[in-house]
């Protein structure tokens, strides 16, 4: 009974053990995921970077120096690539776009740079004795004669090449460029910016004509473009593409009206950072341009006044003919139609309120009037006629009416305080002759009056002055992103690594204690080497940045333009991005690989999604956002894993190196010797068995029965050869059995001898057989060749005979045919000759 109870208990224990083993097997069967590095994944992040410019080489005149310095830009790509991003939704915000700030800074720097080598007009900051230029007609008209006092003839004392001598000169100035010194005396004036700014005269051959500039992203960066036709500049865009450069943007410096820009593809679009905030500017993009033609009809002349060694001041000398006022013409029908479309959009935004357009509320001339550059002169046009209407339900209820053309009176200003900067002013030299220019109005800048929301009227005025809004009207659909080509994701693949395992210890292991320590010390510095590699890269980049700052500080000496600096910066950025990525790939042991497995296990705390949900349902952008908070941790673990791998390899190499001195005494070497010996013995035994079997088969074929391998049997003699006796000295035949031997070495020698003899006989027989076969094949081949040669000769002769027979038959047939033709011709000829004779005979018979 006791034995049966023990057996029952063992049965329960056996079942429990099997169940536990099955559970362990199931748990161990769960697939483990490992971190895999991917290079070149489509992931980007918003960033700010230095953009460089591209421009059409044929877009500028080489005779003059354009203020935009586009000759320093790279040529435009004749086939620009635009890649549409399917199923991508991206956020855009034109009001927080660093591209706008960068363009603003670039344009200001370009203007400043173009003025650096030009003449400073400090000697002209003297008292000017001015009087009004007499006009033949003082009628104030939009397109008639200029108002009295608009142009002043001023005389002043100027020091020329000799410092102690003063000479009196005169020049014509516009009213906007001078201010009275004393209100009591209307004859004493000074230049408008002398008390606040240093006035620099624009160089004579500088042109202000806007040239399209393409902003381009350096390598490692990209520009995203929103292609929604009704995009308001802020929010999500579902039609996104990536480009390397923007479209050509003309840096037109103007206020109130946007000139020569891009048009909306469908309806008019209005954009604002916040429509409820009346302090925010409203940018209007038209869908159809409105032509504006401007002219300065006065025929001006230009003269130069020397104000020092190598310096000249250019001013208006005389005005030939009538002094007529500059003006601009706009089609009233086109303008009213444009306002009607703008009103529709404004009423949608402001709850169908009455829309009122009115003139500017005041400020600097650049704000109050529509200012722009026309042919080198800076026009300031009164835009009251454009913004003087009330719209109720998209119908114009009141406003200035007139003929079909709106004529805007314009004034000209030569001293420009650009960009509202303090301490800097520019004097634009007068342009001789008449000036005409034509532009396209593609947008408006509006401001809304504040007040209580209960009012049913919204008043809008022309705005401007901040050139950033001009650039926003073109850059609203772009944003710069940084490409992040490195991505990590879980996979089932694991990197094969060198494990730290115990070596077999031989006699030389006694010396490996301290010798191996030297290798461990070198391997322990791998962390330090990693840090040094990172610091080295940072030092290179920092050195390049310092060099760029030095070049930028000394660019007036190096004659580098703003675009040249930006191109250098863009190249450095590209190199930096590449080096950074390659540095990480090298630290991780992934150099030159696009897909790199690692030995880092995937932690489900980073993401517990399954492989199918990751690889089949998520984009790289979504996955990057999923693990964004753990990316640095994963990078660190990959780096530590690679460091451990390199340390293991280093220690393994160290052990191999020092163990080689004592390899004859290492147990691994002796195991190798034993393995070779066993292989040799096994081979001999196998050969012995094979040849024994062959010998037995051979003997059986000859009529002998297989006996023991070591039994000596005398060969039987033939009936014609009787056996000899011991006393007789007859000749003995060779026995077929060998002599019995004793000992292992003797047996090996006999076997090897038999093996070599057997191999020799078999190879000889094989060689003889091959020789006979080759001889037979050669003989047969020669006979076949002779047969084919005879056959070829026979058929050649037959063909020759057939050809000769054919030619003979043809010749005979031709000869017979020729004879018949000749006979027919002769008969015809004789008949013709006999015709007169027949006629004569017929006449004779008739007469008889």
UniProtKB/Swiss-Prot annotation:
InterPro entries: Gp120_core_sf, Gp160, GP41-like, HIV1_Gp120. Residues 294-327 are annotated as: V3. Residues 130-153 are annotated as: V1. Residues 566-584 are annotated as: Immunosuppression. The chain crosses the membrane at residues 677-697. Residues 360-370 are annotated as: CD4-binding loop. Residues 452-463, 454-463 are annotated as: V5. Keywords: AIDS, Apoptosis, Clathrin-mediated endocytosis of virus by host, Cleavage on pair of basic residues, Coiled coil, Disulfide bond, Fusion of virus membrane with host endosomal membrane, Fusion of virus membrane with host membrane, Glycoprotein, Host cell membrane, Host endosome, Host membrane, Host-virus interaction, Lipoprotein, Membrane, Palmitate, Signal, Transmembrane, Transmembrane helix, Viral attachment to host cell, Viral envelope protein, Viral immunoevasion, Viral penetration into host cytoplasm, Virion, Virus endocytosis by host, Virus entry into host cell. Residues 504-524 are annotated as: Fusion peptide. Residues 714-735 are annotated as: Disordered. Inhibitors targeting HIV-1 viral envelope proteins are used as antiretroviral drugs. Attachment of virions to the cell surface via non-specific interactions and CD4 binding can be blocked by inhibitors that include cyanovirin-N, cyclotriazadisulfonamide analogs, PRO 2000, TNX 355 and PRO 542. In addition, BMS 806 can block CD4-induced conformational changes. Env interactions with the coreceptor molecules can be targeted by CCR5 antagonists including SCH-D, maraviroc (UK 427857) and aplaviroc (GW 873140), and the CXCR4 antagonist AMD 070. HIV-1 lineages are divided in three main groups, M (for Major), O (for Outlier), and N (for New, or Non-M, Non-O). The vast majority of strains found worldwide belong to the group M. Group O seems to be endemic to and largely confined to Cameroon and neighboring countries in West Central Africa, where these viruses represent a small minority of HIV-1 strains. The group N is represented by a limited number of isolates from Cameroonian persons. The group M is further subdivided in 9 clades or subtypes (A to D, F to H, J and K). Belongs to the HIV-1 env protein family. This is Envelope glycoprotein gp160. It comes from Human immunodeficiency virus type 1 group M subtype B (isolate JRCSF).
């Amino acid at each position: 009974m006791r034995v049966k109870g023990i057996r029952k208990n063992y049965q329960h224990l056996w079942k429990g053990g099997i169940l536990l083993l099955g559970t362990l097997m199931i748990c161990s069967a769960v697939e483990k995921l490992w971190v895999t590095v991917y290079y070149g994944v489509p992931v980007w992040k918003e960033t700010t970077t230095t953009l460089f410019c591209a421009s059409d080489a044929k877009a500028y005149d080489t005779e003059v120096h354009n203020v935009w310095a586009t000759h320093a830009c790279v040529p435009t790509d004749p086939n620009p690539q635009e890649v549409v991003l399917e199923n991508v939704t991206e956020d855009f915000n034109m009001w927080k776009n660093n591209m706008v700030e960068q363009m603003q800074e670039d344009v200001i720097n370009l203007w400043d740079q173009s003025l650096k080598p030009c003449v400073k007009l400090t000697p002209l900051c003297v008292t000017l004795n001015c009087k009004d230029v007499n006009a033949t007609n003082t009628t104030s008209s939009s397109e008639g004669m200029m108002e009295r006092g608009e142009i002043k003839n001023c005389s002043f004392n100027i020091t020329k090449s000799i410092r102690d001598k003063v000479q009196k000169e005169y020049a014509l100035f516009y009213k906007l460029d001078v201010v009275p010194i004393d209100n009591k005396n209307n004859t004493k004036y000074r230049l408008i910016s002398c008390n606040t700014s240093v006035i620099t005269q624009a160089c004579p051959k500088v042109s202000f004509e806007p040239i399209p500039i393409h902003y381009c992203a350096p390598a490692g960066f990209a520009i995203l473009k929103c292609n929604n036709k009704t995009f308001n500049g802020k929010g999500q865009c579902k039609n996104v593409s990536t480009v390397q450069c923007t479209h050509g943007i003309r840096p037109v410096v103007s206020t109130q009206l946007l000139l020569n820009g891009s048009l909306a593809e469908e309806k008019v679009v209005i954009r604002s950072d916040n429509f409820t905030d009346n302090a925010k500017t409203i940018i209007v993009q038209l869908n159809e341009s409105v032509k504006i033609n401007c002219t300065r009809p006065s025929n001006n002349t230009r003269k130069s006044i020397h104000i020092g060694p190598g310096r000249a001041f250019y001013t208006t000398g005389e005005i030939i003919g009538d002094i007529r006022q500059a003006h601009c013409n706009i089609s009233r029908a086109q303008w009213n139609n444009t306002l009607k479309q703008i009103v529709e959009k404004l009423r949608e935004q402001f709850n169908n309120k009455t829309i009122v357009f009115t003139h500017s509320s005041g400020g600097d001339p650049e704000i109050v009037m529509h200012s722009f550059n026309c042919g080198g002169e800076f026009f300031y046009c009164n835009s009251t006629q454009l913004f003087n209407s009330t719209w109720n339900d998209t119908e114009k209820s009141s406003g200035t009416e007139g003929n079909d053309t709106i004529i805007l009176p314009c004034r000209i200003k030569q001293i420009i305080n650009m960009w509202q900067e303090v301490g800097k002013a520019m004097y634009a030299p007068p342009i001789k002759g008449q000036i005409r220019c034509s532009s396209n109005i593609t947008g408006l800048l509006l401001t809304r009056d504040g007040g209580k929301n209960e009012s049913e009227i919204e008043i809008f005025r022309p705005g401007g002055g901040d050139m950033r809004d001009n650039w926003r009207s073109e850059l609203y659909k772009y944003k710069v992103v940084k490409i992040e080509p490195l991505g990590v994701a879980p996979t089932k693949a694991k990197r094969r690594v060198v494990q730290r395992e115990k070596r077999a210890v031989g006699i030389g292991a006694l010396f490996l204690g301290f010798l191996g320590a030297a290798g461990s010390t070198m391997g322990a510095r791998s962390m330090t080497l990693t840090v040094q590699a990172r610091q080295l890269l940072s030092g290179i980049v920092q050195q390049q940045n310092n060099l760029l700052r030095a070049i930028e500080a000394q660019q007036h000496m190096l004659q580098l333009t703003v675009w040249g600096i930006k191109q250098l910066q863009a190249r450095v950025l590209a190199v930096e991005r590449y080096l950074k990525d390659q540095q990480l790939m090298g630290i991780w042991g992934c150099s030159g690989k696009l897909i790199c497995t690692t030995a880092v296990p995937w932690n489900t705390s980073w993401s517990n999604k399954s492989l199918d949900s990751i690889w089949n349902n998520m984009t790289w952008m979504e996955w990057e956002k999923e693990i964004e908070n753990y990316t640095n941790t994963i990078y660190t673990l990959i780096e530590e894993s690679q460091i451990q791998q390199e340390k293991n390899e280093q220690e393994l190499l160290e052990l191999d190196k020092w163990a080689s001195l004592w390899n004859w005494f290492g147990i691994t070497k002796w195991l190798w010797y034993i393995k070779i010996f066993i292989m040799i013995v096994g081979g001999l035994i196998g050969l012995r068995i094979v040849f024994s079997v062959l010998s037995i088969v051979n003997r059986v074929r000859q009529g002998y029965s297989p006996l023991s391998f070591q039994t000596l049997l005398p060969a039987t003699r033939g009936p014609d050869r009787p056996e000899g006796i011991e006393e007789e000295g007859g000749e003995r035949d060779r026995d077929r059995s060998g002599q019995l031997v004793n000992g292992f070495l003797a047996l090996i020698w006999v076997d090897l001898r038999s093996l070599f003899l057997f191999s020799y006989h078999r190879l000889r027989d094989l060689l003889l057989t091959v020789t006979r076969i080759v001889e037979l094949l050669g003989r047969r081949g020669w006979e076949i060749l002779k047969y084919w040669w005879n056959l070829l000769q026979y058929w050649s002769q037959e063909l020759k005979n057939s050809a000769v027979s054919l030619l003979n038959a043809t010749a005979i047939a031709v000869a017979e045919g020729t004879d018949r033709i000749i006979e027919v011709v002769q008969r015809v000829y004789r008949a013709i000759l006999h015709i007169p004779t027949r006629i004569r005979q017929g006449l004779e018979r008739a007469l008889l």
